[in-house]
Amino acid sequence: MVPKVVDLQRIANDKTRITTYKKRKASLYKKAQEFSTLCGVETCLIVYGPTKATDVVISEPEIWPKDETKVRAIIRKYKDTVSTSCRKETNVETFVNDVGKGNEVVTKKRVKRENKYSSWEEKLDKCSREQLHGIFCAVDSKLNEAVTRQERSMFRVNHQAMDTPFPQNLMDQQFMPQYFHEQPQFQGFPNNFNNMGFSLISPHDGQIQMDPNLMEKWTDLALTQSLMMSKGNDGTQFMQRQEQPYYNREQVVSRSAGFNVNPFMGYQVPFNIPNWRLSGNQVENWELSGKKTI
């Protein structure tokens, strides 16, 4: 059997309302006792009974359990718990101080933000048109100076990156031959160096036995002329002068073929002089003399 649904609203009939109160009060006390016993918790009830429609005086409250001491102990315990849980206390003075500090922090943040991202200076409102034009020209000039300074700095950095530092140990004679030996692409001094019409080193290094004395002679010559090595953009080694270019101020005169045969008479270097190195008259004199190449 389905239980009847109770209409939850105040009972208008006084007699029926008082009867319902007595029944439900007994049921409520029974449930409170079961709850306290089964769960092991302290429980108390304070109930104010109903009054008639014409009765203004409120009836005496009813308590459960009937022992008033137990009820007061539970109420006192509740009050103590509530008072200790509210640890944060304040008064009017503290509240006003907290509000003032909060407003001060907000004001500082606003001023800092305005100073950092300022879009207009109030002093400019009092300037004339000529003064504003002068300020505009000054700002434009400062901007151009900054751009020019930045371009110069970039050019200086790029120029320094293109320059190859000069190896200082090349100026020492004991490191100069080793440096030349480690450069396979270096074949010798350039042609016509110091008015000599032939290369000092043959491009075929494997066919000629190098003389250590001759290598030392070339090292001394390079140090005398203040030569240095630099590397090009493609990795090629070039011979360049350290300071002023060297010019041979001797008068250029026609030299005999015998002069160009072997400028280093004390060294055994087997090499021949090709005909294209000599002028026409020198070739004829060489062939008519009947001399043989070394």
Swiss-Prot record:
Q: Which GO terms describe its cellular component?
A: nucleus
Q: Which UniProt keywords apply?
A: DNA-binding, Nucleus, Transcription, Transcription regulation
Limits of the MADS-box domain: 1-51
Swiss-Prot/TrEMBL GO biological process terms: positive regulation of transcription by RNA polymerase II
Which PROSITE patterns does the annotation name?
MADS_BOX_2
Query: Gene3D superfamilies from the entry?
Result: Transcription factor, MADS-box (3.40.1810.10)
Q: Where in the cell is it found?
A: Nucleus
Q: GO MF annotations for this entry?
A: cis-regulatory region sequence-specific DNA binding; DNA-binding transcription factor activity; DNA-binding transcription factor activity, RNA polymerase II-specific; protein dimerization activity
Q: State the protein's purpose.
A: Probable transcription factor that may function in the maintenance of the proper function of the central cell in pollen tube attraction.
Q: What is known about its subunit structure?
A: Interacts with MEE14/CBP1.
Q: Which PANTHER family match?
A: SERUM RESPONSE FACTOR HOMOLOG
- The name this protein goes by in its record: Agamous-like MADS-box protein AGL82
Q: What is the lineage of its organism?
A: Eukaryota, Viridiplantae, Streptophyta, Embryophyta, Tracheophyta
Name the gene behind this protein.
AGL82
